[in-house]
């Protein structure tokens, strides 16, 4: 899987970086966990502070567009971010821990 950063903006009001990316892959759409691990390595971010908001694939294409946010503080992340998005990202992390 390859990830290309489309845009990387700093949002000082919400104390976060907003990253739009394009993930190209072979086979099945990668999980949020797989994309998150790759983004953490590319962006030099903490895994706990990175939230993948969307990961959308167009039918028949081997690429997915995504939107991720990197927060400076966990307290701000929990205040600003929707609970459903946080749960989606936490479920992927819980699955990773269960596999180990």
Curated annotation (Swiss-Prot):
Superkingdom field: Archaea
Transmembrane segments: none
One of the GO biological process terms: translation
Pfam families: Ribosomal_S24e
Region forming the signal peptide: none
InterPro entries in UniProt: Nucleotide-bd_a/b_plait_sf, Ribosomal_eS24, Ribosomal_eS24_CS, Ribosomal_uL23/eL15/eS24_sf
GO molecular function: structural constituent of ribosome
Protein keywords: Ribonucleoprotein, Ribosomal protein
GO cellular component: ribonucleoprotein complex; ribosome
Family: Belongs to the eukaryotic ribosomal protein eS24 family.
Protein name, as recorded: Small ribosomal subunit protein eS24
Organism: Methanococcus vannielii (strain ATCC 35089 / DSM 1224 / JCM 13029 / OCM 148 / SB)
Gene it is expressed from: rps24e
